[in-house]
C-alpha cells in the first residue's frame, strides 16, 4: 500500500516537534522544503503525490529545477530535509531505501566568519548608552549586546532566555541551544554589570494600556512581551551603524567576533567549542583560518622578506 505524501510529511513534522523537539524555525524550514517537493511532484503527476513518486530521478529533477532559482546553500539544506525525512521513514518501517542519500550535495564555498576589531566591538556594545530613546530600552540593548559579544550567544538563544536562567552570583547563564541542548555559559564582568543595571529598570517595560508584562522572559519589548529575533537584528544593525559605521551588522557577527577575539587571546579551541555550543570541533576551527589570515596580513605588512622586490629595491 502506498502512502499519501502529505500525510507522511505531517507525521514527520509531528515527530520533529514533539519527539525531537526541534526549534520552531527548524520545524518551519523542514515543512516548507517538503511542501515544495510535494507541490513539484503533484504538478508533474497531475495528482496528489505519494511516497512511491519520490525516486532518485524525480528528486534529481526537483533539485535541478531548484538550482536555477536558489543558492547552493539553500539547495543543500532542502536536500538535507528530504534525507532526514527518508531516514525517518526507514526507521518507521515505511521505506526500504533512501533515494535522497544517493544524490550529491552541491559544493559550497566555505565562507570565513565576519567579525569586528576589538575597538569596533567596544564601540558597538557601548552605542546604546549614548543613543536617543527610552532609558529602560537602551539599558536592555546594552545588556543584550554585552551577552551577544561577551558570551557569544546565538540570537535565538538570547531571546529565549528567561529570568531564572540567570545565575549572576555564579557568573553564568543557562542557555538552550540547537537541538534544545542546554549548556552553562560564563557571564563576564561587563555583561553582569549591564544586566544588573537593566534588571533594575526592567519593570518599566510593560504594555502601555494594560500594564501587563511577561514576568518570565529576560529581555522584553516596549509592550512587555518577549523580544523577538527580528527586533534584535534591527537593533544590532542600528547600533552597528551608530558605533562602527556598520549598518549591515548581524547578531551572528558579534558571536563570531567573540570567538575570534578569544582565540587571538590564547583561548583553547575546545573551550571555545564548549562556550559556543558547537557539536563539531570543525565548526569552531573556522576561526583558526580567520586568525591565520590576520597573521598573514601582518606578516605581509611587517616582515622584510614578505615585501615585493620592487619595494625592497626602492629602499636600498
Where are these regions (language model features)?
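Conserved catalytic core of the tyrosine transesterase superfamily
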Residues: 1-316
Amino acid at each position: 500500500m502506498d502512502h499519501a505524501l502529505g500525510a507522511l510529511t505531517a507525521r514527520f513534522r509531528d515527530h520533529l516537534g514533539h519527539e525531537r523537539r526541534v526549534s520552531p524555525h527548524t520545524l518551519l524550514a523542514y515543512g516548507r522544503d517538503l511542501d515544495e517537493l510535494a507541490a513539484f511532484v503533484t504538478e508533474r503527476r497531475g495528482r496528489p503525490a505519494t511516497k512511491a513518486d519520490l525516486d532518485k530521478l524525480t528528486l534529481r529533477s526537483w533539485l535541478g529545477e531548484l538550482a536555477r532559482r536558489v543558492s547552493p546553500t539553500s539547495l543543500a539544506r532542502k536536500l538535507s530535509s528530504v534525507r532526514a525525512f527518508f531516514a525517518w521513514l526507514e526507521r518507521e518501517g515505511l521505506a526500504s531505501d533512501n533515494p535522497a542519500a544517493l544524490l550529491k550535495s552541491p559544493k559550497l564555498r566555505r565562507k570565513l566568519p565576519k567579525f569586528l576589531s576589538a575597538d569596533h566591538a567596544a564601540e558597538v556594545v557601548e552605542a546604546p548608552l549614548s543613543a536617543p530613546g527610552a532609558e529602560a530600552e537602551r539599558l536592555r540593548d546594552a545588556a543584550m549586546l554585552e551577552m551577544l559579544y561577551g558570551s557569544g550567544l546565538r540570537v535565538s538563544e538570547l531571546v529565549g532566555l528567561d529570568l531564572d536562567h540567570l545565575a549572576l552570583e555564579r557568573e553564568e547563564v543557562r542557555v538552550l541551544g540547537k537541538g534544545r541542548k542546554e549548556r552553562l555559559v560564563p557571564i563576564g564582568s561587563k555583561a553582569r554589570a549591564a544586566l544588573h543595571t537593566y534588571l533594575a529598570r526592567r519593570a518599566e517595560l510593560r504594555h502601555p494600556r494594560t500594564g501587563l508584562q511577561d514576568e518570565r522572559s529576560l529581555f522584553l519589548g516596549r509592550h512587555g512581551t518577549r523580544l523577538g529575533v527580528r527586533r534584535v537584528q534591527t537593533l544590532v544593525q542600528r547600533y552597528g551603524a551608530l558605533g562602527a559605521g556598520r549598518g549591515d551588522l548581524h547578531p551572528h557577527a558579534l558571536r563570531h567576533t567573540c570567538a575570534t577575539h578569544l582565540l587571538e587571546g590564547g583561548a583553547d579551541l575546545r573551550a571555545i567549542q564548549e562556550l559556543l555550543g558547537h557539536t563539531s570541533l570543525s565548526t569552531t576551527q573556522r576561526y583558526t583560518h580567520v586568525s591565520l589570515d590576520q597573521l598573514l596580513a601582518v606578516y605581509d605588512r611587517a616582515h622584510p622578506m614578505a615585501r615585493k622586490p620592487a619595494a625592497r629595491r626602492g629602499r636600498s
